[in-house]
């Protein structure tokens, strides 16, 4: 099987000869697929949406500038609100940047770590899993858009991007002008008949943005511990959202999370998004999955959600979230959102066990997974 496409084949597939710039709104002075020149710093932050930069870590402090979607800033230090705490919000964290302070929930913690691309698929394999290790990478669609997510972006003249920490399945490699590109295939990397909820979109991106996953990325944590002694406890209390992993009575991991929302966008109490209380069992794990649901206006459609550990047949899962940084505060439609590094640890620790060859793993029997308890404190 030929793994490297010719330049002619690549241009034909990606639509360059058909005026690809007409539907990808990138700056004309650079290639649509070229990685941007991100700030130089060990720690960076990606802006989720329009935000103000303040002179002090407080919403009452003057604004010195405004930043917009996907701008990247140097992340110098995380601090808490200066002066009296703002009792209207739960999260009091701010990030100090060279230009001032930004409210931490509005910045994704990212790094810029380009990689040396491979030029061929591993021998005997149909593809490989890879993680985005730069703040974002612009993607070019092959063929017609299938998912609502991509259709909406293109209709609004917005770029199609993957973001830091997303994990995707790469099934083709191409070279163009001395630059190597990978193709992300939403349907790849899973056993036959399992699509991971995807619509089957095919997207090309600059290869240096992606790090190949290794067996160590999915290696089990504490494999010698009796699986029946492992337990996950999720606290969905509205102002105290946490997750703990136990081996017997010993807590071995702790992190902040975001469970299902208690209120709608107008502040009205709602119940349809709450993470279900009670005892559950992990039954499926997926290295990367396409998540969608809800209705028009309140629905969601998100590709490449990494490190998903499903604990309910209704689709509730513990998984990474790259679209917000407001952990400790309810934010989801019922799932348990984690920082990517937290979701990955839980994924490796809980059962069933995965391998790179087995992107999706399903527990044998309904009770053979890891015990999950969702509770709510009453004060």
What role is predicted for each listed range?
Residues 227, 264-265, 272-277, 284, ...:
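Exported/periplasmic cell-wall-interacting domains
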Residues 31-38, 93-134, 185-227:
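Boundary regions of SH3-family modules and the immediately adjacent low-complexity/disordered segments
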Residues 57-69, 149-162:
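SH3/SH3-like (including bacterial SH3b) beta-barrel domains
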Residues 2-3, 9-30:
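N-terminal export signals
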Residues 49-58, 140-152:
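Short, structured beta-strand/loop micro-motifs enriched in basic residues and often containing a Trp
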Residues 67-109, 159-208:
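SH3/SH3-like beta-barrel superfamily modules
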Residues 173-277:
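Cell wall/extracellular polymer interaction/catalysis modules
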Residues 24-59, 72:
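C-terminal segment of N-terminal export signals and the immediately downstream linker at the start
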């Amino acid at each position: 099987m030929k793994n490297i496409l010719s330049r002619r084949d690549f241009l034909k597939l990606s639509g360059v000869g058909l005026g690809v710039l007409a539907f990808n709104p990138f700056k004309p002075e650079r290639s649509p697929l070229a990685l941007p020149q991100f700030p130089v710093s060990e720690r960076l932050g990606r802006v989720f949406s329009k935000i103000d930069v303040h002179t002090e870590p407080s919403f009452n402090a003057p604004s010195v500038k405004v930043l917009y979607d996907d701008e990247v800033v140097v992340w110098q230090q995380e601090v808490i609100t200066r002066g009296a705490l703002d009792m209207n919000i739960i999260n009091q964290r701010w990030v100090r940047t060279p230009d001032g302070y930004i409210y931490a929930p509005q910045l994704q913690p990212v790094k810029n770590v380009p990689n040396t691309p491979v030029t061929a698929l591993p021998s005997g394999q149909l593809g490989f899993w890879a993680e985005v290790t730069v703040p974002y990478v612009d993607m070019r669609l092959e063929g017609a858009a299938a998912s609502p997510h991509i259709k909406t972006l293109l209709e609004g003249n917005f770029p199609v991007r993957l973001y830091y920490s997303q994990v995707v399945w790469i099934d083709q490699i191409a070279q163009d002008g001395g630059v190597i590109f990978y193709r992300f295939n939403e349907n790849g990397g899973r056993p036959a008949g399992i699509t991971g909820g995807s619509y089957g979109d095919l997207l090309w991106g600059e290869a240096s943005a992606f790090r190949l996953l290794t067996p160590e990325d999915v290696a089990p944590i504490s494999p010698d511990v009796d699986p029946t002694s492992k337990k996950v406890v999720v606290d969905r209390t509205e102002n105290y959202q946490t997750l703990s992993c136990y081996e017997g009575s010993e807590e071995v991991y702790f992190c902040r999370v975001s469970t299902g929302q208690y209120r709608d966008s107008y502040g009205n109490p709602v119940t349809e998004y709450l993470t279900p209380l009670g005892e559950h069992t992990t039954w499926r794990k997926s290295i990367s999955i396409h998540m969608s649901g809800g209705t028009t206006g309140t629905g969601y459609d998100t590709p490449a959600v990494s490190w998903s550990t499903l604990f309910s047949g209704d689709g509730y899962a513990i998984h990474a979230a790259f679209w917000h940084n407001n952990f400790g505060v309810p934010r989801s439609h019922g799932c348990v959102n984690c920082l990517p590094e937290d979701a990955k640890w839980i994924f490796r620790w809980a059962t069933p066990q995965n391998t790179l060859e087995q992107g999706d793993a399903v527990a044998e029997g309904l009770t053979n997974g890891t015990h999950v308890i969702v509770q709510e404190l009453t004060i």
